[in-house]
Amino acid sequence: MAASDIAGRVEEMARPLAERKGLELVEVQYVTEGGRRYLRVFLDKPGGINLDDCEAVSRELDRALDDVDFIPHSYVLEVSSPGLERPLKRAEDYVRFKGRLVQINTYAPLNGRKKFSGRLMGSGEEGVTILLGEHELATIPWDQISKARLAVEF
């Protein structure tokens, strides 16, 4: 079973579990690092999550995963916050974080570049609009966004 398939199945299991606890499932990753496999589940909620939130989801998800036992290898389950540089995955994320500093990478160059950093000004059918510098707006089409995340403001 491919890593993306495993992550997808775990996401289907974890999303309702997180929502019952008032949490948002941000992302699920199944990766191999240094010869070990990790199943990473990232959660959030307004105001941020705490250790008790992570522990509760980890405990329930671990039991559920043991019951269905579809992951063919041993792995380490990690449940945590997405951190300050949280990924932006869904259209709702762009609405929620309007006004924040973001970093967006594209699949192909747009106006000669593939990396954009700026203030998230909005989103719509055509894509995401960010303010680059003081006066330059850039609209990045949805289908060109390969990776987007919040950026830390100092």
From Swiss-Prot:
Superkingdom as given in the UniProt entry: Bacteria
Gene3D superfamilies (alphabetical): Ribosome maturation factor RimP, C-terminal domain, RimP-like superfamily, N-terminal
SUPFAM superfamilies per UniProt: YhbC-like, C-terminal domain, YhbC-like, N-terminal domain
Protein name from the UniProt record: Ribosome maturation factor RimP
Swiss-Prot/TrEMBL GO biological process terms: ribosomal small subunit assembly; translation
InterPro entries with a match to the protein in the record: Ribosome_maturation_RimP, RimP_C, RimP_C_sf, RimP_N, RimP_N_sf
Function: Required for maturation of 30S ribosomal subunits.
PANTHER family: RIBOSOME MATURATION FACTOR RIMP
GO cellular component: cytosol
Organism listed in the record: Desulforudis audaxviator (strain MP104C)
Record's subcellular location: Cytoplasm
Tagged with keyword Metal-binding: no
Family label: Belongs to the RimP family.
Keywords linked to the UniProt accession: Cytoplasm, Ribosome biogenesis
UniProt entry tagged with the keyword Cytoplasm: yes
